[in-house]
Every structure is written in C-alpha cells, then in structure tokens.
C-alpha cells in the first residue's frame, strides 16, 4: 500500500469518528435544550477541546512536518483523540437520574 492510500485510509477513519462525535454532540445538545447555561458550557468546552486536539496533533506530528507521512500521522492522532471524546460523550448520555457528577440529564 502506498503512502497516498494510507493517508486516505487514516483520513477516512478520522472522518468516521468525527461524524460519530457530532451525532453524540447533537444528542447532548438536545438533552440540554432546557438548560441554556449548561448548553453554553458544552459549546465552550467543545470549542476548546477542538483547539486542544488540533494543537496536540500538530505537536505530536512536528517531527515529521512536511513529510509525506505527516497527513497519516495527523489523522491517526486526531482519530485517537476523537475516539476518546466519543467515549466521554457516550458516558454522558448514560448518566443515571440524580447523578450530580454528570453534566447531562438522563433521558426522559
């Protein structure tokens, strides 16, 4: 498999994880529809998280900057961090009613 193909495969994996993350984000937003303050905190947290993800992956791939492998390494980094965020969002959506350690109310 050539580098262009590997770059495309890693990008496709990241895009799939990002799509899942966005689906979960919309579900969390829907649960917070009656709580504007917490919804605002979600938006802020996600914006900061995206900046962190991008900066972290730039840092992690700095040794290969400009090389043909860089896109693959960047996509792999972004995919890994996005999958971790997906797990966080999935756990938020499984909170038990009355769990004060969880920012997302249980499904009604």
Predicted regions and their residues:
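N-terminal alpha-helical modules
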Residues: 1-108
